[in-house]
């Protein structure tokens, strides 16, 4: 199910038809990798978990489907990503507004964490995602990236996705295919701010980028 701004919901049966074959194939081929599945639907989450998914990424933070929390609590080995989003994908980019950006998102996280724990989900199985590009203006997104440390107060792993998102084009009107420079810059900032998981499209490019940074940082001086 696409979560792009303006995207229409996908019926549950269609989502299952899309996920089950590829998830089955991936898990059969690679038994040890960690698999995260994006879904707001409890039935899809349950099927994915039974096929070996390790993480459920719910962009609604357990609000869309009242049975999602029950499915997750029934599988205590599975972790969940709770993402902040103002509105729904169909309308989230229609004049998003905050009186207190960080205060409102942190209050949302506190409420969702409390709800998850009451439903039997372990605190240390929760990841938080401030939702870059989900119900935020470009300015909001830049503010979030500049101050991601504001979310460390929850003492939970942080997840951020910035890859090719529209806020990058705010600066130069670039197309989706032209946003790799901005993607890497935003990803670097997120890493420096202590983000634990960076969601990306081009794994190889990001791996190379961070490997080079690591190599440079490990060298005390350059010799010709």
Which sequence ranges carry the predicted segments?
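Conserved C-terminal portion of the radical SAM core fold
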Residues: 117-119
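Active-site metal-binding loops of divalent metal-dependent hydrolases
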Residues: 132
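Short acidic capping loops at alpha-helix termini that bridge into adjacent secondary structure
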Residues: 32-33, 122-125
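Active-site-adjacent loop and "lid" segments of alpha/beta metabolic enzymes
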Residues: 3-28, 33-34, 39-43, 49-50, ...
């Amino acid at each position: 199910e696409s979560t792009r701004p303006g995207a229409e919901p996908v019926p549950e049966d269609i989502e299952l038809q899309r996920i089950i074959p590829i998830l089955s194939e991936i898990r059969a081929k690679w038994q040890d990798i960690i698999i995260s599945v994006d879904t707001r639907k409890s039935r899809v989450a349950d099927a994915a978990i039974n096929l070996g998914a390790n993480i459920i990424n719910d962009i609604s933070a357990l609000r869309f489907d009242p049975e999602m929390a029950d499915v997750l609590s029934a599988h205590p080995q599975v972790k969940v990503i709770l993402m902040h989003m103002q509105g729904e994908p169909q309308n989230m980019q229609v004049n998003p507004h905050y009186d207190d950006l960080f205060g409102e998102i942190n209050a949302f996280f506190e409420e969702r964490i409390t709800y998850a724990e009451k439903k039997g989900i372990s605190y240390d199985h929760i990841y938080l995602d401030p939702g870059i590009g989900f119900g935020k203006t470009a300015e909001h997104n830049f503010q979030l990236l500049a101050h991601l440390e504001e979310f460390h107060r929850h003492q939970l792993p942080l997840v951020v996705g910035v890859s090719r998102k529209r806020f990058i084009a705010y600066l130069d009107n670039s197309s989706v295919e032209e946003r790799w420079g901005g993607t890497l810059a935003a990803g670097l900032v997120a890493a420096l701010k202590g983000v634990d998981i960076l969601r990306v499209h081009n794994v190889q490019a990001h791996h190379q980028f961070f490997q080079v940074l690591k190599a440079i940082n490990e060298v005390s001086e350059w010799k010709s």
